[in-house]
């Protein structure tokens, strides 16, 4: 794998910034190709942030984690797909009907807007959950990994393009789905970084070795004094 391909595998989370701050930040990070827009940033700035990032020729992971009844998810995916984003996240636990409706609606919306259709990925179990919290807070009898495997299968059967999981589960999922199913992994931390509010974490090298397709990295880069250097250092540490 060459360094150019590695740059395409890292998605920078910029949720803590407004548009002007994001503009200044991305000017300092010319090597970054992918940007994640989450609920905080999209709620603050709305669709304008998508237009802004597209004008910078960035690829966009719109991580709004839609989770609602099928009709509402269908309508939401239809609308945001018209913005020309590259990946949209929905909660896998919304069920088969909601997932298939979301996928089909994204194709229709993109077609209407004459943009490329986005990949739809399903959120399995949030990386902020520890095993104890997952068992006690949600009253789940099965392990996190077993639930991730079950939800990933639901995504695959519903025709989604991939799922979001922690790097801990990526190895097992990759053994099941080989290379025709995208595995996006948050919970990425460098060896010197605090885990913050994440629990099931790995280094970038470990996550890719486990089968992750793309890595979502936020504070390790966004809080750095020289973010572009840190980004390239991460690429070099994997290469």
Swiss-Prot record:
Pathway: Pyrimidine metabolism; UMP biosynthesis via de novo pathway; UMP from orotate: step 2/2. GO terms for cellular component: cytosol. InterPro entries: Aldolase_TIM, OMPdecase, OMPdecase_AS, OMPdecase_bac, OMPdeCOase_dom, RibuloseP-bd_barrel. GO terms for biological process: 'de novo' pyrimidine nucleobase biosynthetic process; 'de novo' UMP biosynthetic process. GO terms for molecular function: orotidine-5'-phosphate decarboxylase activity. Pfam families: OMPdecase. Substrate binds at residues 15, 36, 63-72, 127, 189, 198, 218-219. It is an enzyme of class 4 (lyase). Keywords: Decarboxylase, Lyase, Pyrimidine biosynthesis. It catalyses: orotidine 5'-phosphate + H(+) = UMP + CO2. Its EC number is 4.1.1.23. SUPFAM superfamilies: Ribulose-phoshate binding barrel. The active site is at 65 (proton donor). HAMAP family: OMPdecase_type1_B (MF_01200_B). Catalyzes the decarboxylation of orotidine 5'-monophosphate (OMP) to uridine 5'-monophosphate (UMP). Belongs to the OMP decarboxylase family. Type 1 subfamily. Homodimer. This is Orotidine 5'-phosphate decarboxylase. It comes from Prochlorococcus marinus (strain MIT 9515). The lineage of its organism: Bacteria, Bacillati, Cyanobacteriota, Cyanophyceae, Synechococcales.
């Amino acid at each position: 794998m060459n360094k150019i391909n590695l740059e395409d595998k890292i998605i920078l989370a910029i949720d803590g910034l407004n548009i002007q701050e994001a503009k200044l930040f991305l000017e300092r990070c010319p090597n970054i190709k992918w940007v994640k827009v989450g609920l905080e940033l999209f709620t603050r700035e709305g669709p304008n942030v998508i237009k802004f990032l597209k004008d910078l020729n960035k690829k966009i992971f719109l991580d709004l984690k839609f989770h609602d009844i099928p009709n509402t998810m269908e309508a939401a995916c239809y609308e945001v797909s018209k913005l020309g984003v590259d990946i949209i996240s929905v909660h896998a636990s919304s069920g088969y009907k909601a997932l298939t409706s979301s996928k089909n609606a994204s194709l229709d919306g993109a077609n209407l807007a004459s943009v490329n259709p986005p990949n739809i990925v399903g959120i399995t179990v949030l990386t902020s959950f520890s095993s104890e919290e997952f068992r006690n807070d949600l009253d789940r009898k099965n392990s996190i990994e077993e639930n991730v495997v079950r939800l990933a299968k639901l995504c695959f059967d519903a025709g989604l393009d991939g799922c979001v999981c922690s790097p801990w589960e990526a190895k097992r999922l990759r053994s099941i789905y080989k290379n025709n199913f995208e595995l996006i992994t948050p919970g990425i931390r460098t060896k010197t970084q605090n885990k913050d509010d994440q629990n099931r974490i790995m280094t970038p090298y470990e996550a890719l070795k486990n089968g992750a397709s793309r890595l979502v990295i936020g504070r390790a880069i966004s809080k750095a004094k020289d973010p572009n250097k840190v980004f390239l250092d991460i690429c070099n540490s994997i290469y």
